Amino acid sequence: MTKSELIARIAERNPHLYQRDVERIVSTIFDEIADALARGDRVELRGFGAFSVKRRDARMGRNPRTGETVDVDAKVAPYFKTGKQLRELLNGGESESDDD
């Protein structure tokens, strides 16, 4: 699902909201999550999951094509850990919000 598909689905399920307002809300949520991660904060959406940042140390790597060793710089990468309700839903269980 793309961001525009998500916006369209939310607007469909909430006919009292204008699609442009839903777009602003979704964009604001994504921006806030990205800003929090950029600050090094953790974002927890209980039941859904938690976004955090993992720091990876610099290391020696190997070019798989040539076998040559190369320096791999330290980096920061986003990380997502699923919440219990989402894991249960994906594994065939029922989630509490299935009563739509």
From Swiss-Prot:
A GO term for molecular function: DNA binding
Protein's UniProt keywords contain Transcription: yes
Cited CDD domains: IHF_B
Signal peptide start and end residues: none
Subunit structure: Heterodimer of an alpha and a beta chain.
Entry similarity comment: Belongs to the bacterial histone-like protein family.
Protein name: Integration host factor subunit beta
Species assigned in the record: Rhodospirillum rubrum (strain ATCC 11170 / ATH 1.1.1 / DSM 467 / LMG 4362 / NCIMB 8255 / S1)
Organism classification: Bacteria, Pseudomonadati, Pseudomonadota, Alphaproteobacteria, Rhodospirillales
